[in-house]
Every structure is written in structure tokens, then in C-alpha cells.
A protein has these predicted regions:
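Nucleic acid-binding interface residues in structured DNA/RNA-binding domains
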Residues: 2-12, 18-21, 25-124
Length: 124
């Protein structure tokens, strides 16, 4: 059995988050980790390609749907919006048709993370 790359895992997470957005759901890191079979700790590096792809392509910040259980807020690596914008950005994510957009390939996600590293850096 081969081990999945970070970009392949990010592609899995994209599908989970696309469905969550359609259902107007917020997920915790623990929930996402259980759904894809990885520990919640360290999930941030798997979310980065998605965040980078959204930033690069002018899409709503899909990763805003993943929050810390204790705070209800995205983790420290989330940089696609500032705290004052979270509620509005979540609504943008809910309103976007992720099924129509479709999931990017693992290669496209990996390329976005390489071209625009986003974990903990400013979205501006």
C-alpha cells in the first residue's frame, strides 16, 4: 500500500469541505482528521494547499470551515482572512457552489502551495 502525499490528502479534504460548505457546516480539526484517517494535530499542513489554491484563484477561503474545538476559530495557520472577517467569509464559502467548481487535482493543489505558501502568512 502506498502512502498518500500531502497534496493527495488535501484533495481528500477538499471533498469533505465542499460537502460541509453545501450543508452550511463548520468542522473541527478532530472531525476532519477522523474523516480522512489522520491525526488532527498537524492537519494544518494538509490544509495549506487548499488555502493557497483558494487565494491564488480568487475563491472564498474554504479552509475557514475547519476550526479549533476549544475556540470555534480557525487555527494559527489560517491566513485567508482576519478575525473581523470570519463571519462574512464563512457566508461567502457557504454561498459558493463548490460542486460546480469541482475539486482541483492534487497536482494543482501542490502547485498552489509551492507558488503561494500561505500557512501563517498574510492573505494580502
Amino acid at each position: 500500500m502506498s502512502i498518500m502525499t500531502a497534496s493527495e490528502r488535501a484533495s481528500q479534504i477538499w471533498g469533505v469541505l465542499g460537502l460541509a460548505a453545501r450543508n452550511r457546516q463548520i468542522l473541527t480539526y478532530e472531525m476532519v482528521g477522523r474523516l480522512i484517517g489522520v491525526p488532527a494535530r498537524g492537519l494544518g499542513h494538509l490544509l495549506e494547499p487548499i488555502q493557497s489554491y483558494c487565494l491564488t484563484n480568487g475563491l472564498p477561503p474554504l479552509t475557514i470551515l475547519v476550526v479549533q474545538e476549544a475556540t470555534g476559530l480557525p487555527g494559527p495557520g489560517f491566513s485567508a482572512a482576519n478575525a473581523g472577517e470570519y463571519a462574512r467569509k464563512q457566508l461567502d464559502v457557504f454561498a459558493f457552489d463548490w460542486m460546480e467548481h469541482g475539486a482541483p487535482t492534487p497536482e494543482a493543489l501542490g502547485r498552489a502551495a509551492s507558488e503561494r505558501p500561505s500557512r501563517g502568512s498574510s492573505a494580502e
